[in-house]
Curated annotation (Swiss-Prot):
One of its GO terms (biological process) is lipid catabolic process. Glycans are attached at residue 332. One of its GO terms (molecular function) is triacylglycerol lipase activity. The active site is at 193 (acyl-ester intermediate), 303 (charge relay system), 392 (charge relay system). Disulfide bonds join 58-82. Keywords: Disulfide bond, Glycoprotein, Hydrolase, Lipid degradation, Lipid metabolism, Signal. Its EC number is 3.1.1.3. This is Lipase 1. It catalyses: a triacylglycerol + H2O = a diacylglycerol + a fatty acid + H(+). SUPFAM superfamilies: alpha/beta-Hydrolases. It is an enzyme of class 3 (hydrolase). Belongs to the type-B carboxylesterase/lipase family.
Amino acid sequence: MSVTSTSLNGTFNGISEDGIEIFKGIKYANIPYRWAYAERIDDYDNGVFDCTQEGMACPQVLPFDYNIEKGPKEMPFDEFECSNLMITRPQGATNLPVFVWIHGGGNLAGNGYCSDHNPVPFVKHSIVAGRPVLHVMIEYRLSAFGYLAVPDTNGNWVGNWGARDQYTALQWISKHIVEFGGDPSQITIGGESAGSIGLHALMVHESMKPKEECIIHNVILSSGTMDRMGTGTISENAFKPIYDGIKTLVGDINTCSADELLEAQIKAGLDLGFYLQDDFFPPDWRNVRFKVSRVLLSDVIVDGTNFKNKINPAVRVTPENDFDHKVFKLYNISTEDTWEDYHYKMMLFKGDETFIRGNQQLELLFEQENIPVWRQLFDQIHPNDPSRLCHHAVDLYYMWDNWEMPEDKHAVARQYQDTLTKFVYGQDPWPVDKLHYVHDNQFEILDKSQFGDFRNVPALKFLLGFSAEELGELTKKYTGEGHYTL
């Protein structure tokens, strides 16, 4: 099964299985050298390409504990070949709505070919539901390869390589997806955690463009905004100390091996992929006017589970200032709490402070601009282990539906996929003036005034009274050494 494109000047041979066609490892850009801007490919020089094998992922360490049974898939890594994408479509697709997915992983790790992101069940169910969707997954540069700021030949600091890759991929999709049966006028882009943060970053980037030039219109943001990741100058985000630390360890950062660079970034303290305030973003990026048309905004009640290993007995907090005392009061934390109770309450706090606060900020901005927002609370617990609660990224189990789990959980997954495909089709997944609450195998449509029944509104209001920078300083002592958990 193949696609021969005159406009792309190439032939792409894919896989056809059980009514689904898959094209893997399509390069959307060339990366000429380390820390170079990706160069979009629009002409494939009359080549014939084997798209039956998984594409390369960006080299990465795995400093995370994964909240998924299947775990990170062993992948071939190549920093110069990771600018690729995978297209999954119904057989014979023509003019279908497109759903693009940006994977998470803290901008340090992850890949779209990982078995937990397999889109085949999603696409199959979209056919059954009568809303067939063409799905695209994108790879992009990660960790130091994607988010280290480096000085150029003029001494100016440049970065955001991974974010620029993501935008280049979206440009390729907008321009060329019609060759694979997608409708370029109906593209929805989604992401979870760092994927959602990245999508927010791309929306900020497009705020600098005239609306007619924008390619991001319909978005699904799940548990991640730029709010606490932010952008910064060299000193504010500590890029230069990290750069200097890596350079001290490896010598020439441009010619050292990928493995040497990865080992050095850990020792130098690069534990998340931050954004650089350069020409990719407007100076006042927190107060832009978004150009998107429709938004589905979602989070999870215990989004703070990705801090669970960083909240440890060695950093148990004793209230010392007004901020601490207020946090303890708002989350009903006591110095007499058992470790289990303290740990759970701190995860609630970190989830609010890191993720849900940002969603609340974005929702207010969207509403001020009359951009419709479908607000969702995804509080469905882990499908196989209730003790893991409704943790950060738990919605991915139900989005992709490719794990072994009880049939009632598969039913929840199918209903959730219905919700998402309706949004992708430009339909209302639920009334836009209502709240969508997913819990205990139920999909409830509630009045938005009931938001406070399921989220800590007094705490969110308190946290919104501080800037992200202030929160960064005030909450440093609340977490310690340890891996993030995805």
